[in-house]
Protein backbone atom coordinates (compact mmCIF):
# COMPACT_ATOMS: atom_id res chain seq x y z
CA UNK A 1 0.00 0.00 0.00
CA UNK A 2 2.90 2.34 0.58
CA UNK A 3 4.55 4.11 -2.30
CA UNK A 4 7.38 2.42 -4.16
CA UNK A 5 10.86 3.90 -3.88
CA UNK A 6 10.72 5.10 -7.49
CA UNK A 7 7.29 6.72 -7.04
CA UNK A 8 8.40 8.48 -3.89
CA UNK A 9 11.64 9.70 -5.49
CA UNK A 10 9.70 11.03 -8.49
CA UNK A 11 7.26 12.94 -6.28
CA UNK A 12 10.10 14.41 -4.21
CA UNK A 13 11.93 15.46 -7.39
CA UNK A 14 8.78 17.12 -8.79
CA UNK A 15 7.89 19.12 -5.68
CA UNK A 16 11.21 19.91 -3.97
CA UNK A 17 12.26 23.54 -3.59
CA UNK A 18 16.01 22.79 -3.73
CA UNK A 19 18.18 19.72 -4.31
CA UNK A 20 17.81 17.31 -1.41
CA UNK A 21 14.66 18.97 -0.08
CA UNK A 22 12.38 16.32 1.39
CA UNK A 23 10.84 18.22 4.28
CA UNK A 24 9.16 21.21 2.71
CA UNK A 25 5.37 21.33 3.08
CA UNK A 26 4.92 20.94 -0.68
CA UNK A 27 6.83 17.65 -0.73
CA UNK A 28 5.08 16.34 2.37
CA UNK A 29 1.62 17.22 1.04
CA UNK A 30 2.38 15.67 -2.35
CA UNK A 31 3.55 12.42 -0.72
CA UNK A 32 0.50 12.30 1.55
CA UNK A 33 -1.79 12.96 -1.42
CA UNK A 34 -0.23 10.09 -3.38
CA UNK A 35 -0.63 7.76 -0.39
CA UNK A 36 -4.24 8.87 0.13
CA UNK A 37 -5.08 8.28 -3.54
CA UNK A 38 -3.51 4.84 -3.39
CA UNK A 39 -5.48 3.93 -0.26
CA UNK A 40 -8.76 5.11 -1.78
CA UNK A 41 -8.32 2.48 -4.48
CA UNK A 42 -7.72 -0.11 -1.77
CA UNK A 43 -10.99 0.78 -0.05
CA UNK A 44 -13.00 0.29 -3.22
CA UNK A 45 -11.99 -3.37 -3.13
CA UNK A 46 -11.87 -3.75 0.68
CA UNK A 47 -14.72 -1.73 2.09
CA UNK A 48 -14.64 -3.33 5.53
CA UNK A 49 -10.98 -2.65 6.24
CA UNK A 50 -11.59 -0.30 9.16
CA UNK A 51 -8.07 -0.60 10.55
CA UNK A 52 -6.55 0.90 7.41
CA UNK A 53 -9.32 3.49 7.26
CA UNK A 54 -8.01 4.89 10.55
CA UNK A 55 -4.61 5.36 8.91
CA UNK A 56 -6.26 7.06 5.94
CA UNK A 57 -8.07 9.51 8.20
CA UNK A 58 -4.80 10.24 10.00
CA UNK A 59 -3.09 11.01 6.68
CA UNK A 60 -5.93 13.29 5.59
CA UNK A 61 -5.73 15.18 8.88
CA UNK A 62 -1.94 15.53 8.61
CA UNK A 63 -2.28 16.86 5.05
CA UNK A 64 -4.90 19.36 6.23
CA UNK A 65 -2.55 20.60 8.99
CA UNK A 66 0.32 21.02 6.53
CA UNK A 67 -1.91 22.87 4.07
CA UNK A 68 -3.14 25.19 6.84
CA UNK A 69 0.48 25.87 7.83
CA UNK A 70 1.47 26.64 4.24
CA UNK A 71 -1.57 28.88 3.77
CA UNK A 72 -0.56 30.89 6.84
CA UNK A 73 3.06 31.20 5.68
CA UNK A 74 2.69 31.86 1.95
CA UNK A 75 -0.70 31.99 0.23
CA UNK A 76 0.76 31.98 -3.28
CA UNK A 77 2.65 28.72 -2.66
CA UNK A 78 -0.51 27.27 -1.10
CA UNK A 79 -2.64 28.22 -4.11
CA UNK A 80 -0.09 26.86 -6.56
CA UNK A 81 0.13 23.55 -4.69
CA UNK A 82 -3.65 23.15 -4.48
CA UNK A 83 -3.98 23.78 -8.21
CA UNK A 84 -1.10 21.46 -9.08
CA UNK A 85 -2.41 18.57 -6.98
CA UNK A 86 -6.02 19.12 -8.03
CA UNK A 87 -7.32 19.38 -4.48
CA UNK A 88 -10.53 21.23 -3.79
CA UNK A 89 -10.50 24.13 -1.42
UniProtKB/Swiss-Prot annotation:
- MF terms per GO, please? rRNA binding; structural constituent of ribosome
What keywords does the record list, in alphabetical order? Ribonucleoprotein, Ribosomal protein, RNA-binding, rRNA-binding
The record's listing under SUPFAM superfamilies reads: S15/NS1 RNA-binding domain
- GO cellular component terms? cytosolic small ribosomal subunit
Biological process GO annotation list? translation
What SMART domains has UniProt attached to this entry?
A: Ribosomal_S15
Family statement drawn from the similarity comment of this UniProt entry: Belongs to the universal ribosomal protein uS15 family.
Q: What is this protein called?
A: Small ribosomal subunit protein uS15
Q: Which organism is it from?
A: Pseudomonas fluorescens (strain Pf0-1)
